[in-house]
A protein has these predicted regions:
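A conserved structural/catalytic subdomain of Rossmann-like adenosyl-cofactor enzymes
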Residues: 5, 285, 291-515
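Non-catalytic, mostly N-terminal accessory regions of nucleic-acid modification and defense proteins
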Residues: 1-206, 210-211, 215-216, 273-284, ...
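Glycine-rich, flexible loop segments associated with nucleotide phosphate handling
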Residues: 73, 174, 221, 329-331
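Tryptophan-centered motif/residue detector
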Residues: 15, 28, 258, 307-308, ...
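Generic marker of residues within folded, mature protein domains
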Residues: 168, 240-241, 267, 390, ...
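N-terminal hydrophobic or amphipathic segments with adjacent small-residue motifs
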Residues: 30, 221-223, 255, 346, ...
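Conserved S-adenosyl-L-methionine
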Residues: 193-299, 304-315, 320-325, 335-336, ...
Length: 515
């Protein structure tokens, strides 16, 4: 079986299981149990592989807890970031899942033990609270202990039945792909609420490629509103292992999504010392001010959310916002995220940020921020994307590309909203690989393409009140039928002549009838 076929079959199976085991429970509400169980299996098998070290004589899952040497425990915590004793492994819990009357409390104790194993170590912040959303006492599992255990057992046995093969034989990231597949499906089915934490992979790939263009290596990659981490992971997939020296950095305000992001890092084989995901409000409580700058910033922040803005008089003196001389409006924080990203961007780096289109043409504070960005030559490109690419919204959003190392003062505008840049599917439009390739090529070339792309000098933008809407600069193709007026007039004349002839013939017939 080819690796891609294996992946497709695995994903079909895991979605079938996810729907079967949830029963009448809404899939969105049940997602943490399926995702958490998949993660539990992954770290168990990953941990076994590490302990056994490829030695066929070592069978860690069959060992007694007390037989694990203390030096092995210390090494595992230092290297992997956590400890899982043999009895706590997924495979051993799954053996007796249907017959264990204490399954829910045993699982809770195991998850707590894994988290406690990192206490006081470098990995603590990556492990602490990781299983917080896997509530084994939740009423979503059932109304009594027996019902809860049956549903937990069904999830565990379902995940156990999935064929991931052995870690050493994986040609593709099966666990990570399965997790991303589940998140994607949950997001698609949840509509608007799902779109808040997941950026579709095709859009993520475009954003990552824009941010990384021309960079063979980057010091660190950062997403200030990282959701489930999908954008950060696209950077990993594009650059591969070892290229990002300082790792992956992100901040997320939603606790459940924050845990999904941390699990996602582990599931894609990013070790605890290579990722930094923080919980909190990026705009009011940024966590990585001492860790900037970043060579690559990718982000799909929430659109037009409210924030305190001018309600907090200290923010105008914040080094992120002060240079613009004005704060983003209280009702629309979009440019606050943009200015935050700009402040964290290195002199050699690039930021690619998804933006609501209104920020590019509205007046007031947003116009002043646009002026600051353009006058200081930070805006490299604005790209208008097709509509209906994201879950939960049909809005045609834009991508703003920021750079601090532009070779000239021109700003590029690309209109990728037309049908030549997407494929229409049942519920959403999709960017195919050829669409992404063409967009990146146009972005890289900076050449004018009729009806698609143009580069505009600073003066022209200033004279247009710093409007950065793509439609203000890229002429839309007139797809109406071209009419040949001379030919049309000739045809009209012939038709009139024919009508006159017919009218004369009719008059002659009437005369004959009256005679």
């Amino acid at each position: 079986m080819t690796s891609l076929k294996q992946r497709d079959e695995l994903q079909a199976a895991i979605w079938r299981i996810a729907n079967d085991v949830r029963g009448a429970v809404d899939g969105w509400d049940f997602k943490q149990f399926v995702l958490g169980t998949l993660f539990y299996r992954f770290i168990s098998e990953n941990f076994c592989q590490y302990i056994e070290g490829g030695d066929p004589q070592v069978h860690y899952a069959q060992m007694a807890n007390e037989d694990v040497p203390s030096e092995v425990v210390a090494d595992a915590i230092a290297t992997k970031g956590y400890m899982i004793y043999p009895s706590e492994l997924f495979v051993n819990v799954a053996k007796h899942a249907y017959t264990n009357p204490n399954l829910n409390t045993d699982l809770s104790a195991i998850f707590s033990a894994i988290e406690r194993s990192a206490s006081g170590t470098e990995s603590e912040s990556r492990i602490r609270g990781l299983f917080a959303d896997f509530d084994t006492t939740s009423n979503r599992l059932g109304t009594n202990v027996d019902e809860k255990n049956k549903r937990l057992a069904a999830v565990i046995k379902g995940v156990e039945s999935l064929d991931f093969g052995s870690f050493e034989d994986h040609e593709i990231d099966l666990f990570g792909d399965a997790y991303e597949f589940l998140i994607s499906n949950y997001a698609a089915n949840a509509g608007k609420s799902g779109g808040e934490f997941f950026t579709p992979q095709n859009v993520s790939k475009l954003i990552a490629r824009l941010a990384l263009l021309g960079q063979a290596e980057v010091n660190k990659v950062y997403d200030p509103a990282c959701g489930s981490g999908s954008l950060l992971l696209q950077v990993k997939k594009l650059l591969g292992e070892g290229v990002i020296e300082g790792g992956y950095w992100g901040q997320e305000i939603n606790h459940t999504t924050y845990n999904l992001a941390r699990m996602n890092m582990f599931l894609h084989n990013i070790n605890y010392d290579k990722f930094h995901i923080a919980l909190g409000d990026t705009l009011l409580n940024p966590q990585y001010g001492n860790d900037k700058p970043f060579d690559a910033i990718v982000s799909n922040p929430p659109y037009s959310v409210t924030w305190v803005g001018a309600g907090d008089p200290t923010l105008i003196n914040d080094t992120r916002f002060a240079p613009a001389g004005v704060l983003a409006p209280k009702s629309k924080a979009d440019f606050a995220f943009v200015l935050h990203a700009l402040n964290y961007l290195s002199a050699r780096g690039r930021a690619a940020i998804v933006c609501f289109p209104g920020v590019f043409y509205r007046g007031g504070a947003e116009q002043k921020i646009r002026q600051y960005l353009v006058d200081n030559n930070f805006v490299e490109t604005v790209i208008a994307l097709p509509p209906n690419l994201f879950y939960g919204t049909s809005i045609a959003v834009n991508i703003l590309v920021l750079s601090k190392h532009k070779p000239d003062t021109r700003t590029q505008f690309i209109d990728a909203s037309g049908e030549a840049f997407y494929k229409k599917e049942t519920n959403n439009n999709v960017l195919l690989p050829q669409h992404i390739d063409r967009l990146v090529d146009i972005f890289a070339a900076k050449a004018d393409v009729q009806y698609v792309a143009t580069s505009v000098n600073h003066q022209a933008i200033a004279e247009n009140d710093y409007n950065l809407s793509v439609s203000s600069y890229v002429e839309a193709e007139d797809t109406r039928e071209v009419i040949d007026i001379a030919k049309l007039n000739s045809e009209v004349a012939q038709t009139v002549k024919r009508i006159d002839t017919l009218r004369a013939d009719i008059d002659e017939i009437i005369k004959q009838l009256e005679a």
